[in-house]
Amino acid sequence: MEQTVMAGAEPFRMEGNETGILVSHGFTGTTQSVRPLGEALAAEGFTVAGPRLAGNGTAMEDHAKTGAPDWIRSIEEDLAWLEGRCSNVFFAGLSMGGMFSLYFAGVRPDLIKGIVP
């Protein structure tokens, strides 16, 4: 069944220079909470990705059916996008997004050059 994403909760990607920054929202949040940071970073020239974590920004029933493996996959898609165009990748996260910045710094130290949890 197709999920309807709330207006403003869509994932975002903004092309810039070779420094990429992934910004992740928190538990039950959406990209609305991190989009202003993403836009400010993009305005400074950075390449920015803001994934919508699976089950967020749709219906609570969708969120109830998702968990950490789903959210990790959501982030991995945007990390792969950044890795394909950036020589340095950083990760900033709000709340649970901050926890994921620590997680990915541990499992992908070859990719993540710094974090802002």
Residue ranges and their predicted role:
Residues D110-P117:
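A conserved short beta-strand
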